């Protein structure tokens, strides 16, 4: 960890991390019934995360949002993360865990949270296990070819930012000619992201299944049908 950090940032980070470890509430008290949500890109996690928050009243904890907030606040942990982000590097797991520990001390986390976008790897799941009690894990599962169809078919109106889809949400004929495909929506990019997902994140399904925590959701259906499956899963959890 030491290469990028200035001595001041490194020292302040260690102080903050020690404070987090000292003040973290006992497991089972601060993290009653936390939920992990994961699935491949384009599986509809964002939509279903909103549904889970509505059904459970648990706050959504996104590492992306936490990183942006920490950097904006200028906190020691945020400064540590910013050095890596500015260098175009992934923020190390121990910094992410430190940010999560801080988030779990907030009052609204007392009855558990919804982890969205974390963990992404088994080592991250092992680290999370040390600071949070995860009571259930929801995996939204969609075949690769369906994911490719969903994402590659997206088109954006550069004038309004509105997203259309060549099959599922066609644009009005009068604006079709100005629609563009975003670089992240090309088939090459999507399949590369899916490969990374299968190598790094998909193994979490078996890891959590071995612990009796996994709930698999068929995400290859309409938004409403997936939502019904999620609601049924939540009713079993609560």
PLM region spans:
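Glycine-rich phosphate-binding loop of ATP-dependent small-molecule kinases
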Residues: 2-238
């Amino acid at each position: 960890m030491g290469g990028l950090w200035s001595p001041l940032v490194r020292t302040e980070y260690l102080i903050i991390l020690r404070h987090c470890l000292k003040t973290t509430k006992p497991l089972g008290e601060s993290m009653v019934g936390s939920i992990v949500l994961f699935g491949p890109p384009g599986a509809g996690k964002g939509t279903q995360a909103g549904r889970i928050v509505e059904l459970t009243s648990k706050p959504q904890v996104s590492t992306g949002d936490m990183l942006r907030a920490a950097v904006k606040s200028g906190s020691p942990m945020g400064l540590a993360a910013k050095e890596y982000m500015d260098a175009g590097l992934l923020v190390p797991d121990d910094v992410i865990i430190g940010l999560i520990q801080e988030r779990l001390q907030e009052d609204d986390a007392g009855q558990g949270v919804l982890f969205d976008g974390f963990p992404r790897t088994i080592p991250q799941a092992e680290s999370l296990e040390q600071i949070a009690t995860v009571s259930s894990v929801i995996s939204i599962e969609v075949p690769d070819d369906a994911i490719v169809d969903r994402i590659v078919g997206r088109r954006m109106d550069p004038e309004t930012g509105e997203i259309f889809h060549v099959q599922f949400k066609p644009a009005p004929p009068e604006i079709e000619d100005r629609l563009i495909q975003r670089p992240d929506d090309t088939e090459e990019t999507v399949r590369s992201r899916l490969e990374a997902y299968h190598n790094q994140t998909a193994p979490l399904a078996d890891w959590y299944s071995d612990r009796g925590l996994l709930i698999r959701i068929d995400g290859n259906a309409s938004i409403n049908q997936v939502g019904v499956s999620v609601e049924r899963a939540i009713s079993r959890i609560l």
